[in-house]
């Protein structure tokens, strides 16, 4: 079994991780991985049971089964598009010379899916290049100015202002406004 290092997962699976639950004679290994590593592992058939992004689960729907419990859906918890420059946006890049660089926390993450959905024109017109990076390295890369934009998840959602970064858009709020459903 493989789960993410997300606090939601480690809390939900605490009983299993710390062997507080009777396994009824079953024995299995548990791997804690970044969400992109989990998605890649599922594409490579490495796991029998694993957490996946909803984006990856949709792509893999012909060969995987989504369990009826354990999913995280919610309001007000989506990824944030951040920049180290105030007032910057991939949409502004449409009228600017050159190409910007946007970091996403993995190709088949929900965060990357939302960026592609809402900023597809900037990607299509080659005004921003998408690169994938470990979620915990995105904000440091923005601060170092090695990228123009970053789609941040987990604790970055709450600490970006303290890091001197600027909010371009709350992608989760936009999803909720445009669809009326919780963010997967």
Where are these regions (language model features)?
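Short loop/helix-cap segments at secondary-structure boundaries that form the rim of catalytic
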Residues: 58-61, 115, 159-162
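Bilobed "Venus flytrap"/periplasmic-binding protein-like clamshell domains
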Residues: 1-19, 77-149, 155
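A generic structural signal for short, non-catalytic loop/turn and secondary-structure boundary residues
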Residues: 23, 59, 74, 160, ...
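General small-molecule cofactor/ligand-binding pocket signal
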Residues: 29-33, 129-133, 168
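Hydrophobic/proline-rich hinge and linker segments of small-molecule sensing/allosteric domains
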Residues: 66-90, 173-184
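Pocket-lining segment of extracytoplasmic ligand-binding domains
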Residues: 133-184
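Short secondary-structure junctions
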Residues: 65-66, 128-129, 166-170
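N-terminal hydrophobic or amphipathic helices and topogenic motifs
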Residues: 1-72, 88-95, 101
């Amino acid at each position: 079994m493989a789960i993410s290092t997300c606090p939601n997962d480690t809390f939900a699976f605490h009983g299993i991780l710390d062997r507080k639950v009777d396994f009824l004679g079953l024995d299995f290994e548990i791997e804690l991985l970044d969400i992109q590593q989990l998605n890649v592992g599922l594409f490579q058939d490495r796991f029998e049971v694993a957490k996946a992004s909803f984006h990856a689960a949709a792509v893999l729907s012909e060969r995987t089964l989504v369990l009826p419990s354990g999913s995280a859906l919610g309001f007000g918890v989506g990824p944030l598009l951040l920049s180290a420059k105030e007032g910057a946006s991939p949409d502004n890049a449409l009228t600017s010379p050159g190409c910007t660089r946007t970091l996403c926390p993995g190709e088949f993450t929900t965060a990357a899916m939302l960026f592609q959905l809402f900023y597809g024109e900037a990607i299509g017109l080659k005004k921003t290049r998408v690169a994938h990076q470990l979620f915990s390295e995105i904000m440091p890369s923005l601060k170092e100015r090695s990228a123009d934009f970053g789609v941040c998840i987990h604790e970055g959602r709450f600490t970006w202002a303290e890091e001197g970064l600027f909010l371009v858009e709350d992608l989760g709020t936009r999803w909720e406004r445009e669809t009326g459903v919780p963010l997967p």
